[in-house]
Structure formats: structure tokens, C-alpha cells
């Protein structure tokens, strides 16, 4: 895919940003904890979340779908499927399903694409094995495909050494099948969509005031079925916020965006860098929702070292902002970037250099010198949707060819359509 330099300003109101991926995954998986029909409007129709629907279908759920409205009728009992459960490119789907299936009697095989099957799963499989789960796979159950033989699990008191919503949610799901009360704690607060949704479903879970500790009781009855409207994804919206900032005389308003405090850290970073950006809350139900207004801005360099778990998905796009800011910027304490869909530290630095930007890898992040003269280049996405979309936005300034853009469909199927509607010229 080739993105040509955009010569005109962008002025738009965007209401069709992709639905939130994290909430879509959880809606589908958590429906298996109920016994009645679950309904979601604005479900994300991307490859990752459609794969999750297929997984729960193979576990016995009945699914009705009309456009982005999805109804799920859970099975009375989870089936032991006669096929591999394909998670595609989604680490969220795989890690959450490991936790869910570990305590269900049956035999299950989870696999994914070539990128997912090389991402670390021991952070989930190890603590589950310690409480009685039987999980088998390459490199001591660190790499998929993974085979899970569901067992009754022992209660646990688990302290996570990493701040990860995926680890947290997997352990919560396993705790529901344990033989007694379980506790979970983490070193810093990760995304809390699971807690928010499960509390709305009347799950037997208690959260400490600071959000760092959980007490989870085994399930004694089905949870309350869901009927929700899924807001739009702030991680997906971020690309078009960035576009408005870097393109002269541009302004964009984005509506129905999820504004959960654990999801807007990257927006706060842009504000600290000088971006003219406002977030307004319009609804506060089980999640905080609102609109974002942003316009062309001059950015200044910044050091980012806190709340990294809250901006891990936006880090590649933030690197683009760093490259266009005045002065040096850095991101540290972000070693988790090395085990995402790609090694995002290495890949961002490699590709930014190809575009004429001075960038340097750190063990746990990167340093970028802003204000370099950009040049048109061909970059590699390494199958990582966030790398591809970040450089597509940079391409609006200098023109860029991206070697694998199909990966964008895993999270944001109408990204190219929106980009084209804003005036971008795109060739395949």
C-alpha cells in the first residue's frame, strides 16, 4: 500500500471510528458466563474480534449477527470442540481463553497466526499450572499452539510482576472455577474493562479503592446477561487525532469515543506536548464515553516514563508525534513493547530511520530527535497493525509505501476508508 503526501487540510467530524476492541473481546468471552441472551450494538467487525466469535461458537454458543449488532446465546455447558480454536493475531483472545478454559473439563487447542504463535504465553500458563491447570505447548507452554486439559483449579493469591489487563483477566476467569476465594494484585493499574463489565454483570468480585487488588469468589450461579452499546476505540481514534495535529490548518471532532481513564494517557501526553486537544465526557455508564476535539498544533519534545501500561497500544503513533516535535523525546519503562505483535521498539526505530528521522533503541524504549527532514520511504509493518497505521499517518506528510497493510484489518477494518474520505490518495 502506498500513501501519498496530502496537500490539503483535513476538517471532519468522525462518528465511524472502529468499535473498541478490548470491550468487544470481553463481551464475547464473558457471555459464556451467563445463561441468557447477550446483546451488543456496535460490536467490532475486525478479524481479531470475529475470530473470538468463532471460538465461542465452537464452544457451543449460538450467534446471531446483523451488521454490527451481535446476539450471543451461551451453551448450557461448554463443549469440547473437534477443531482448533483459532485466535488469529489476537493476544487478548488467546490469553483470556487460556484463563477461561483452564478450569473447564474438556480438551482444547488454541493457536494463532505465525506472529501470535511466537508471542509469550508463560505469563499466563505458569501461574495457572501452579494452581492445577494442565497446559502444554512449546518452550514449556510459552508458545502456541497450546493444549489445555481443563481441571478443577486451586484457590490462589497471585501477585503479578507485570501490569497487564490480559494477565489480570485470565486469572479472574480462572478464579471463577477455583475451589475457594482467590486474590490478585498488580504493581500498577492496568486497563480495568474486565472489572467494569464483570461488576455490571453482578460477578462475585471486589476491587480495592486503588484498583490494584481484587478478591474473586468462585461462581455459584450464572452472571447477568449483557445488553450494551460498545463505544468507539480510543486507540483507533488516536491515529486521526495525530493526523489533525500534524496536518496544517486541520481540525477533527471524534464522537462516541471510550474515555476510560486507563485508555487516554496517550492523549494526555499529546496535551503536555502542546496539542490543542479537548476531551468532553458525554456519558458515564459502565464506561466513560465522550468526544474529542483536536486541531493543528506545534508539538514539543517530552520524556514519557509513567503509566506505560495505559499507552502501550498508542506508543507507535506517539513515536510519530515525537518525530514531528521540536527537540528530543523519549519513551522508557516500555519493555512490554518488545513482545507485542512485533518488537515495536526495534521496528519503530528501524522504520523511522528509513524516513530520515534520528531514532535510537533503548532496552526498554526509544529516543527520537524531532524536526528532522522527512523523506519518502518503503517500510515494513512486520504484520503489526499499529505499525502500519502509524506510518500511514506519517505518509500524509512525506509519502510512504507499507509492505503489509492487510494486518490493519485485524483491528480497524474501515481505517483506509476513513483515510480516503479525508482526502488521502492511496494505491495498492
UniProtKB/Swiss-Prot annotation:
Family statement drawn from the similarity comment of this UniProt entry: Belongs to the EPSP synthase family.
Positions that bind phosphoenolpyruvate: 21, 91, 119, 166, 344, 386
Binding-site residues for 3-phosphoshikimate, renumbered to this chain: 21-22, 26, 164, 166, 313, 340
Location, primary (coarse class): cytoplasm
Record's function text: Catalyzes the transfer of the enolpyruvyl moiety of phosphoenolpyruvate (PEP) to the 5-hydroxyl of shikimate-3-phosphate (S3P) to produce enolpyruvyl shikimate-3-phosphate and inorganic phosphate.
Name of the gene: aroA
Alphabetized GO MF terms: 3-phosphoshikimate 1-carboxyvinyltransferase activity
Pfam families linked to this entry: EPSP_synthase
SUPFAM superfamilies the record matches: EPT/RTPC-like
Listed CDD domains: EPSP_synthase (cd01556)
EC primary class: transferase
PROSITE patterns linked: EPSP_SYNTHASE_1 (PS00104), EPSP_SYNTHASE_2 (PS00885)
Catalytic activity field: 3-phosphoshikimate + phosphoenolpyruvate = 5-O-(1-carboxyvinyl)-3-phosphoshikimate + phosphate
Assembly notes: Monomer.
InterPro entries: Enolpyruvate_Tfrase_dom (IPR001986), Enolpyruvate_Tfrase_sf (IPR036968), EPSP_synthase (IPR006264), EPSP_synthase_CS (IPR023193), RNA3'P_cycl/enolpyr_Trfase_a/b (IPR013792)
Pathway(s): Metabolic intermediate biosynthesis; chorismate biosynthesis; chorismate from D-erythrose 4-phosphate and phosphoenolpyruvate: step 6/7
Descriptive protein name: 3-phosphoshikimate 1-carboxyvinyltransferase
Enzyme Commission code(s) on record: 2.5.1.19
Gene3D superfamilies, sorted: Enolpyruvate transferase domain
UniProt KW keywords: Amino-acid biosynthesis, Aromatic amino acid biosynthesis, Cytoplasm, Transferase
Residues annotated as the enzyme's active site: 313 (proton acceptor)
Amino acid at each position: 500500500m502506498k500513501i501519498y503526501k496530502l496537500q490539503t487540510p483535513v476538517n471532519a467530524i468522525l462518528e465511524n471510528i472502529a468499535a473498541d476492541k478490548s470491550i468487544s473481546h470481553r463481551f464475547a468471552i464473558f457471555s459464556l458466563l451467563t445463561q441468557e441472551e447477550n446483546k451488543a450494538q456496535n460490536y467490532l467487525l475486525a478479524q481479531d474480534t470475529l475470530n473470538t466469535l468463532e471460538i465461542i461458537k465452537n464452544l457451543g454458543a449460538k450467534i446471531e449477527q446483523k451488521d454490527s449488532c451481535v446476539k450471543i446465546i451461551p451453551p448450557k455447558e461448554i463443549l469440547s470442540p473437534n477443531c482448533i480454536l483459532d485466535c488469529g493475531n489476537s493476544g487478548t483472545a488467546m490469553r483470556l481463553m487460556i484463563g477461561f478454559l483452564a478450569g473447564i473439563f474438556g480438551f482444547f487447542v488454541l493457536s494463532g497466526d505465525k506472529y501470535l504463535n511466537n508471542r509469550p504465553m508463560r505469563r499466563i500458563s505458569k501461574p495457572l499450572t501452579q494452581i492445577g491447570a494442565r497446559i502444554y505447548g512449546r518452550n514449556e507452554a510459552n508458545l502456541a499452539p497450546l493444549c489445555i486439559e481443563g481441571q478443577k483449579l486451586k484457590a490462589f493469591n497471585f501477585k503479578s510482576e507485570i501490569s497487564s489487563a490480559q494477565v489480570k483477566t485470565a486469572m479472574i476467569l480462572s478464579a471463577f472455577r477455583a475451589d475457594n476465594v482467590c486474590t490478585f494484585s498488580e504493581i500498577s493499574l492496568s486497563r480495568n474493562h474486565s472489572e467494569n463489565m464483570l461488576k455490571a454483570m453482578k460477578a462475585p468480585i471486589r476491587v480495592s479503592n486503588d484498583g490494584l487488588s481484587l478478591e474473586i469468589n468462585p461462581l455459584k450461579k450464572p452472571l447477568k446477561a449483557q445488553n450494551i452499546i460498545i463505544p468507539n476505540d480510543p486507540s483507533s481514534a488516536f491515529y486521526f487525532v495525530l493526523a489533525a495535529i500534524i496536518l496544517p490548518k486541520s481540525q477533527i471532532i471524534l464522537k462516541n469515543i471510550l474515555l476510560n481513564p486507563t485508555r487516554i494517557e496517550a492523549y494526555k501526553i499529546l496535551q503536555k506536548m502542546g496539542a490543542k486537544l479537548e476531551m468532553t465526557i458525554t456519558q458515564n455508564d459502565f464506561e466513560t464515553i465522550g468526544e474529542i476535539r483536536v486541531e493543528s498544533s506545534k508539538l514539543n519534545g517530552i520524556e514519557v516514563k509513567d503509566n506505560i501500561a495505559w499507552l502501550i497500544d498508542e506508543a507507535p503513533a506517539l513515536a510519530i508525534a515525537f518525530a514531528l516535535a521540536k527537540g528530543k523525546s523519549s519513551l522508557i519503562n516500555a519493555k512490554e513493547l518488545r513482545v507485542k505483535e512485533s518488537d515495536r521498539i526495534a521496528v519503530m526505530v528501524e522504520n523511522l530511520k528509513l524516513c530520515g528521522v534520528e531514532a535510537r533503541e533503548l532496552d526498554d524504549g526509544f529516543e527520537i530527535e524531532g524536526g528532522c527532514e522527512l523523506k519518502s520511504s518503503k517500510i515494513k509493518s512486520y504484520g503489526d497493525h499499529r505499525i502500519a497505521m502509524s506510518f500511514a499517518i506519517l505518509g500524509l506528510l512525506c509519502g510512504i509505501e507499507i509492505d503489509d497493510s492487510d494486518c490493519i484489518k485485524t483491528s480497524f477494518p474501515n481505517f483506509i476508508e476513513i483515510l480516503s474520505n479525508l482526502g488521502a490518495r492511496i494505491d495498492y
